[in-house]
Amino acid sequence: MLQRGFTRFQILPSLIALALSAHAMAQTPTAVPAVPASAASAPAAAKPPADPTAPKPFADVIKDAKVEDGLFPIWRKDEKVWMEIPKAMLKKPFLFTVNIANSVGERGLYASQMAGDWMAEFRLVGKQVQLLALNTKFRSLSGEGSARAVEQAFSPSLLGSGAVASLEHPERKSVLIDAGFLLSDVPGYSTRLERAYRLPFAVDKANSSIEATRAEPALSTLTARMHFSTPRIPAPPLVPPPGPVPMPTPPQATPDARSLFVTYVYNFAALPSAAMEPRRADPRLGHFTRSFTDLGSDLKANPRVHFVNRWRLEKKDPAAEISEPIKPITYWIDKNIPVNYRGAVEAGILEWNKAFEKIGFKNAVVAKQ
């Protein structure tokens, strides 16, 4: 009894001490762990990755490349070729021609042929520079208003387009384009091949290349070796048909009828600063002419207009009875002409000077090799 009471009195002070301790803990606020300032602030937004398709600075793209200054400067590094389009030449017409330097050698597909000529211009559209053939078949010779209406009524043609290869030049503001767009069938030569062989020859860009370039103040030239191929030559029918069946006629002048090369020479030439006075054609005289439809007036019975194709000869001394021209008519004797024939060819060219002397021009025609 005494032992049990002693135990009770011993426990009671302990319970009171525990109660007071719990009350004190309740009155003391719970400590909150300190948060570092760097962790408290919101994380910075991640920087978006660079666009891999974004154009690089001009200088970075043409680093170590060699340049030929001209109407359109040409940059070349190994197999890469670029054309620099001056800002002033965007939407400015120039003469664009394509010549055939090498071809198959049969069925009318020969070297030294013309493949087309156009009045053209470059236009910047987004990240592409378009080479457009302007529509000169329909014009207006009477006024600006009708000329604008004619321009809106008839479409130009897209000859090709090149990707913008860099940012514009920081000082010149010019545009750099990849000249690889010229490794395509710009003059439509595949149609000539199909007409000759009735086979679907097409450009093989992977095996085509720009062989040579040349640039002058008024001219830029690029020479492209184009590979044309067709997948297969059709076999004749196993059993002869009862009647005649037209069959493709493969090339006979190539080692493999499925493959051939054609060389294009692209010429970009500046137009003269002052236009030449045109001369209308007279049907009573024989001339090579250039024709178009004049829609400037609706009162004409026949809107077709014919102009004579002629050389631009201007006297150095307009007051002289006979004067040399400012720029003579120049014929280049091709290196393919055999040496023993070149003298005769040159003499034949220069024989025309006798006719020009009668109209006041001396040495109007020159021959160069």
Please name every model-derived segment:
Residues 10-23:
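Bacterial N-terminal signal peptides
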Residues 1-8:
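N-terminal secretory signal peptides that target proteins for export/translocation
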